Amino acid sequence: MTLPLLGPMTLSGFAHSWFFLFLLVVAGLIAIYVVLQLARQKRMLRFANMELLESVAPQRPSRYRHIPAMLLALSLVLFTVAMAGPTHDVRIPRNRAVVMLVIDVSQSMRATDVEPNRMVAAQEAAKQFADELTPGINLGLIAYAGTATVLVSPTTNREATKAALDKLQFADRTATGEAIFTALQAIATVGAVIGGGDTPPPARIVLFSDGKETMPTNPDNPKGAYTAARTAKDQGVPISTISFGTPYGFVEINDQRQPVPVDDETMKKVAQLSGGNSYNAATLAELNSVYVSLQQQIGYETIRGDASMGWLRLGALVLVAAALAALLINRRLPT
């Protein structure tokens, strides 16, 4: 929970929970206050002449006189929570990660069911994704059809990726499995040289395609897409798949209309086997939306951050309120 002016306030993930022992001190102070109030009442009742007492103190103490003490005790409780060091989830930009953008450039990408065609729309959306991805992430690019080619090794130079995207060319057949294996090899290579940690950097493959794998025809083949997806999971590299297009796409090949419907099921299976997520998009706007979602997932990591300042600020406000209440109600600070 985040409150205006106060900041994040949680009651979980305490870094120094032993500070809650201070609540015993607060409880002791409350007990002393109650005992003093009872003793005060007993002293007042010792007056033998009640009429004289009422003439001397005609106004009975206000029932609100305990509010300052209550606020003071509450402020001590709030300060105790702050000292215990609560934490909350904080999203911070990644500065050590690898993302391989793997794009299908097979002939089916000529289909115009997405204006102006699937390839051009894919290029524009991918360039926007590259621009908006967290600057510290190493982004690589692979184009694949019958074979897979690393066009850009993972780098933080976004201009190199965008320039390569502009040069994508169509080719025959679709070897999705080979593309995934090639991406895994590129990730392993760059992971061996990237410093900044005792373990390889986190990595992800973003696979963009519109149709079924044709080389090999069986995705469970040793070089098939499903086999590659299982290998990716074993290496801790999830695959986010994007199936792009509509069921009504077609291309003209040798003056014949060839249907090229989008294949969502294969892409979903690849994502599932790798431990990643699958997306589908039928328009450029939907594709951009998918890339924005991926950018939020890939570009940031969640860590536990300090949430004590909110409790400190609230405790200070309550303490000030206790002092003001004492001056207004009892005409003195609480004792």
Swiss-Prot record:
Residues of the VWFA domain: 98-298
Membrane topology type: Multi-pass membrane protein
Keywords in alphabetical order: Cell membrane, Membrane, Transmembrane, Transmembrane helix
Bilayer-spanning residue ranges: 18-38, 67-87, 309-329
Cellular compartments annotated: Cell membrane
Family annotation (Gene3D superfamilies): von Willebrand factor, type A domain
Record's GO cellular component terms: plasma membrane
PANTHER family registered for this protein in UniProt: LEUCINE ZIPPER PROTEIN 4, SPORE GERMINATION PROTEIN
Homology family: Belongs to the UPF0353 family.
NCBIfam families xrefs: PRK13685.1
Protein name per Swiss-Prot or TrEMBL: UPF0353 protein MUL_1490
